Amino acid sequence: MMTTPTNSKPQLTSLRYRGYVQFAQVLMAFHGVDYDMCYVDKIDDQLRKELKFDQLPLFRETDGFKLNQSLAITKWVGDKYDFIGKSSKERALVVETVACVHTDIVMPAIRSVLTGQGRDRIINVVIPRYFGAFEKVLTENKYLACGDSLTIADLYCYVAYDYLGHLGFAPDHLQGKFPKIDCLKNHFESNKNVQEYLKKRPDDNEFFKNLPDWLKKDSCPTMSC
């Protein structure tokens, strides 16, 4: 059963896996946001009434404002904490990176785990192409948005990098190949709140191995979060 949201904290509701919601979780941990995390095993009728797109995650602000899409949630939180770039060019580069991570890296990786297909492409094309591009930018600039401060672009890069390792996509290919991204990973994981999140986060390998029957019926379960 879903817990009742409090009035004093935002609430994030998700299935018990990392998926796309982990970007918002790491973002809020990094900024020390105090919120209620509510994991559910299914979407019941009561919860479904609150979902604009019949999917999770669902984010509720203290004033009742709701968002039902992971990219919108991270944009909302990033905007509140001045984490989306200082200029229009930086913000455009943030959008470019976030879209790339979401669509070109994480989505095909999850799909590959679910279908058992496309693993070689993740290892031989996706990892070198996209993380190689991010590594090049970080070699030439301090941050991915080419400004003087971290943004959600850097966070998305780190989380995706860590996630592909978790899903078992050739950790040998990742180890030592992208030193600038490794530095980015170390920076985020040195944050005490992020460290606490890492201790408690779900294991997606177990989740996908025991995928609920109702999600198996979804023609594209990767889009549920």
From Swiss-Prot:
EC number: 2.5.1.18
Keyword Ubl conjugation applies: no
Binding site for glutathione: 48, 55-56, 69-70
Reaction catalysed by this enzyme: RX + glutathione = an S-substituted glutathione + a halide anion + H(+)
GO molecular function: glutathione transferase activity
Domain GST C-terminal: 87-207
InterPro entries: Glutathione-S-Trfase_C-like (IPR010987), Glutathione-S-Trfase_C_sf (IPR036282), Glutathione_S-Trfase (IPR040079), Glutathione_S-Trfase_N (IPR004045), GST_C (IPR004046), GST_superfamily (IPR050213), Thioredoxin-like_sf (IPR036249)
Keywords on record: Transferase
GO biological process terms held by the UniProt record: glutathione metabolic process
PROSITE patterns according to UniProt: GST_CTER (PS50405), GST_NTER (PS50404)
GST N-terminal domain sequence ranges: 8-85
Pfam families the record matches: GST_C_3
Membership in a protein family: Belongs to the GST superfamily. Alpha family.
Record function comment: Conjugation of reduced glutathione to a wide number of exogenous and endogenous hydrophobic electrophiles.
Protein name: Putative glutathione S-transferase alpha-4
